Regions:
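Rossmann-like NAD(P) dinucleotide-binding subdomain of oxidoreductase/dehydrogenase enzymes
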Residues: 69-187
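Glycine-rich loop-to-alpha-helix module at the N-terminal edge of alpha/beta enzyme cores
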Residues: 1-68
């Protein structure tokens, strides 16, 4: 797990995610073919899934540009007149993301994108039956400039490890998309 001393700076995260969104758009057909063959769905549905993924990452980029922190006027009493408070957003720590099978590209994008945008490394556990999209996402993020250790993929059939990570005190956030059965196993 990373420490606060080696988080990625905001400008670098924006640049990486912007490149990643562009890569998704540029490789739209290739990614849709992967999602279609992996998930057994029609190609037009997979194209929509890929487009939504690119839009989701671009939304993360725009949110980062607009929301880096706040300056809050403090005039609640005479002693605080003319003073302001500054807030700065900081990463909460590593994110563990467990995802479902039905939209393997889009669901993982909507977990990984916000985690990286927030400055948090992410450990992803894809569905056992649809891991290829997750591996492709991790590969593309590294190609876009994300350090390799920032997006780790747990191999299929490692739900026991994911369950252990849920209770690991070093994990800052847990994201789960999936069935109630798996949710109960993870809790």
């Amino acid at each position: 797990f990373r420490t606060r001393d080696n988080w990625l700076p905001l400008a670098e995260r924006i640049e990486i995610l912007h490149r990643f969104a562009s890569m998704i758009t540029d490789r739209r057909e290739e990614l849709a073919m992967l999602a279609a063959s992996e998930g057994g769905k029609p190609l037009p549905d997979s194209l929509v899934e890929i487009d939504r993924g690119a839009d989701g990452i671009q939304c993360c980029v725009e949110t980062l540009r607009a929301d880096a922190g706040y300056v809050v006027p403090m005039g609640l009493n005479a002693a605080s007149q003319g003073r302001v408070a500054f807030t700065q957003k900081e990463p909460i720590g590593p994110v563990v993301a467990v995802s479902a099978f039905n939209h393997p590209f889009n669901l993982i994008i909507h977990q990984v994108g916000p985690a990286v945008a927030a400055g948090c490394p992410v450990i992803v556990k894809p569905a056992d039956v649809t891991p290829l999209s997750c591996f492709k996402i991790a590969e593309m993020l590294v190609e876009a400039g994300l350090p390799p250790e920032w997006c780790q993929v747990l191999m299929p059939e490692t739900l026991d490890l994911a369950t252990k990570l849920v209770t690991d005190g070093r994990v800052g956030f847990f994201s789960f998309i999936g069935s109630a059965r798996v949710g109960w196993m993870l809790r």
